[in-house]
C-alpha cells in the first residue's frame, strides 16, 4: 500500500457555517469524525492544521492525531497546509493527502485512491472524481465538473457543464444524453510535499479567479493533475446548517446498519 500522510485544514471562521469544525455531529465535533476517517484509511501520520485553540482542544482525546497551529491570515486551505508541512518537517517526496475538514463520511478507499494516483505517474498532484448521475447536478454551478485525457489527467475543471453535448442539450437539458459519462469533482487532493510548497507560492491564475477554483492555478501553470475515480460513494461535505442536518440523518442510518 502507498505510504502517505493526511493533513486536514480546519479553519474556525467558515463563512457559511461559523465554527464548522466544532459543530456537533452525533454528539461529537465534526473535525473529530474527519480525523478518524483519515486514521481508518491507514495514513502514516494525521495532522490537523488550524488557527484556533478550541479546535486543537477538541482533538486532545485522539492521541494519534497531531495539531499544527497555523496563521489565521492564510487565504486558502492550501496555504495552511503548506505551513503545516513545514511544521511537520515532511520530506519533499512525501505523499500528502489534503482531506477537507468538512468531510465526515470520506471513505477510506477514496482517501487511499488519491494517494495511489500520485505513485508511478508524472503528476505532482492528484484528486478524485465520480460520475454525474443527473442533469440537475450537471447544470448546478455549485457542483464542479471536470474532463480527463487518456492519461487520466485533468484537462479542465469548471462550474459549467463540461463537456457540452451539442445535439443532446439542444433537444433537452432535463436529462443526460446517452453515450457520455460526465464527471463530478470531489474536493480531496494529493500532492508531493515539495510541490505543495510550490503550489502555495504560485500567484493566482486568471482562470482560477474567473471560476473561483484554486486547482485551476496548477493547470494554468502547466502542471498535470492525476484524476482517479472514487472506488466508493463519496457523500457530500458539510457547508450549511441544512447539510449538517442531512449528515445527522445519514450518520444515524449508518449506525443502524
Curated annotation (Swiss-Prot):
Enzyme Commission no: 2.7.7.38
Any one GO molecular function term: 3-deoxy-manno-octulosonate cytidylyltransferase activity
Family annotation (CDD domains): CMP-KDO-Synthetase
Pathway: Nucleotide-sugar biosynthesis; CMP-3-deoxy-D-manno-octulosonate biosynthesis; CMP-3-deoxy-D-manno-octulosonate from 3-deoxy-D-manno-octulosonate and CTP: step 1/1; Bacterial outer membrane biogenesis; lipopolysaccharide biosynthesis
Catalytic EC class: transferase
Keyword tags: Cytoplasm, Lipopolysaccharide biosynthesis, Nucleotidyltransferase, Transferase
Subcellular location as annotated: Cytoplasm
GO cellular component: cytosol
Catalytic activity: 3-deoxy-alpha-D-manno-oct-2-ulosonate + CTP = CMP-3-deoxy-beta-D-manno-octulosonate + diphosphate
Highest taxon listed in the record's lineage: Bacteria
Pfam families (UniProt xref): CTP_transf_3
GO annotation terms (biological process): CMP-keto-3-deoxy-D-manno-octulosonic acid biosynthetic process; lipopolysaccharide biosynthetic process
HAMAP family in UniProt: KdsB
Family designation: Belongs to the KdsB family.
Function as written in the Swiss-Prot or TrEMBL entry: Activates KDO (a required 8-carbon sugar) for incorporation into bacterial lipopolysaccharide in Gram-negative bacteria.
Protein name per Swiss-Prot or TrEMBL: 3-deoxy-manno-octulosonate cytidylyltransferase
Origin species: Stenotrophomonas maltophilia (strain R551-3)
